[in-house]
Amino acid sequence: LNADLQTTAYNSLGDRRGAVVALDPSTGKILAMVSKPDFDPNTISQNWDTLVNDENNSSLLNRATMGQYPPGSTFKVVTALDYFRTKRSFNGFSFDCQGSITKEDHTIQCYNGKVHGTEDFYTAFANSCNCAFAEIGTELGGASLLKTSEDLLFNQKLPLTSYRKSSFTLNGSSGIPLIMQTAIGQGNTLVSPMHMALITSAIANDGVLMKPYLIDKVTNAGGDTVSTTEPANYKRLMTSNEAALLGKLMEGVVQNGTATALNGRGYTVAGKTGSAEYDENGSSHSWFIGYSNVDDPDLVVAIIVEGGGTGSEAAVPIAADLFDAYYFD
């Protein structure tokens, strides 16, 4: 762990529920991992009964690796990848967003019903246009989205020792309403912050996911090194060209889209915000995934703030704190 990043992540999340993960995409080294509500390990034996029975806070749950959340619009990186694999290009895409789209009596709206007008693929991604991506999802279909999602380790084992497997339920017989919801990161899809960090790391590392690790080396009482961890490739999740194209989409989010608060801060960032609705009242978790120093990425972050609203409201400011701490502190 990077002590400065860990402290920054802990303090920036504050007393809110959620999780923060930071990785080095080129090695897989976990630089920070925070889950809240947390507990004091020094008093865990005295407080064990309270912690175990506190279902409201679930302090013993490591939300970073075990938490299961709707991905919201961060899932649009998956939908975008599936579109590219199907069409072989983002060029030629055009969509006229009127703020809502209805198919089979099911309506999807953009945030606050915003009308985006005519968009190409890059603009639709930067705007996080739900209508465009609902249309894209129905064109791709459930079977295609399932294949690409499983390529990105949904419904698959992850290179971790303790985690919950992310779930994706679409298939070739799924109906249009569920496909529309799933393509924008709602529906039945559930994912952990660590899993989203791994997908982002592959994008930042030319498509290759490195095996994540916490411990650099183990030494004995005499200071001699007993074992070391060497960075290791886990799996290629996408081609280098696919990773570069997704990176360009994510750069547009910071330059012209929903994460412009990260623009012009002395470093470059590519990212994707998300607002994951979790109840009938439209309450949402705040998401951000991204990486910095886009020409030679060295820091990946994935952040969720439970009940935090839009990605730009709660998660993006935490990302800014992490990037600032990494480059300037």
Q: Which residue ranges define each predicted feature?
A:
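Beta-lactam-recognizing serine transpeptidase/beta-lactamase-like catalytic domain environment
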Residues: 26-73, 78-307
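Short, charged, low-complexity patches
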Residues: 196, 311-316, 320
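Short, gly/Ser/Thr-rich active-site loops of penicillin-recognizing serine hydrolases
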Residues: 225-227, 318-329
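Conserved, well-ordered alpha-helix/loop/beta-strand core segments that scaffold catalytic motifs
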Residues: 1-18
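Short, intrinsically disordered, mixed-charge
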Residues: 14, 251-255, 324, 328
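Charged catalytic carboxylate motif
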Residues: 4, 8, 144, 245, ...
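Short hydrophobic alpha-helical segments used for membrane anchoring or interfacial signaling
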Residues: 20-25
